[in-house]
């Protein structure tokens, strides 16, 4: 399966490429500054990167077009935030800015089963000052894992986003976070 990864000049980009390839994807990396047309098929990946999602407004129309076509979409950190900005949600300063530190996620049985893990807790590595606040009226077509008032994972039809770095060595069972890309998304 092909994947096009949009690189936002982040040092984790090629860690993400390696894990996507290990999952079974053939990955093409494209700088966000060169992103001018959508791939014809495959997975669109918005990787991590610096700044606020609105720093990348120029590419919003392309991403909106991809999302409206229901093409498979994967967002990591900044990619998670860009997805939510395109849904009209706020991206605000986190109450707990975290850079290079582990966060322990509490998993319900549903989330644990979805990841294929028989665990109630899993560590994820975070590098973010910004977050998407938890919602009072969430979209019923999406499932959000929320913790400490922030959306940490979003999944839906042909959609998966993480507000952490699944490709980081600080994320335990990190490949479990990539398996849903083949299991749940339609190509």
Regions found by a protein language model. Give the residues of each.
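Flexible gly/pro-rich beta->alpha loop and the following alpha-helix that scaffold active-site loops
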Residues: 2-3, 10-75, 87
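Generic recognition of short, well-ordered alpha-helical segments
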Residues: 15-18, 57-58, 78, 137, ...
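A general structural detector for well-ordered alpha-helical segments in enzyme core domains, enriched
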Residues: 59-63, 94, 177
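Pocket-forming structural segment of enzyme catalytic cores
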Residues: 65, 74, 81-159, 164-173
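Acyltransferase
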Residues: 166-187
């Amino acid at each position: 399966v092909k994947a096009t990864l949009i690189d936002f000049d982040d040092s984790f980009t090629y860690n993400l490429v390696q894990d996507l390839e290990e999952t079974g994807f053939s990955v093409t990396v494209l700088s966000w500054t060169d992103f001018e047309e959508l791939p014809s098929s495959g997975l669109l990946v918005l990787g991590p990167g610096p700044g606020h999602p609105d720093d990348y407004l120029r590419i919003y129309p392309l991403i909106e077009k991809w999302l409206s076509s229901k093409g498979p979409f994967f967002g990591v950190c900044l990619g998670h935030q860009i997805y939510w900005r395109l849904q009209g949600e706020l991206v605000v300063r986190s109450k707990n800015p975290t850079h290079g530190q582990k966060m322990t996620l509490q998993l319900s049985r549903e989330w644990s089963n979805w990841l294929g893990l028989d665990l109630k807790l899993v560590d994820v590595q975070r590098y973010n000052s910004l977050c998407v606040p938890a919602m009072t009226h969430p979209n019923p077509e999406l499932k959000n894992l929320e913790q400490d008032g922030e959306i940490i994972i979003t999944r839906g039809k042909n959609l998966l986003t993480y507000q952490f770095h699944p490709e980081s060595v600080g994320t335990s069972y990190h490949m479990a976070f990539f398996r849903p890309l083949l299991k749940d998304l339609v190509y």
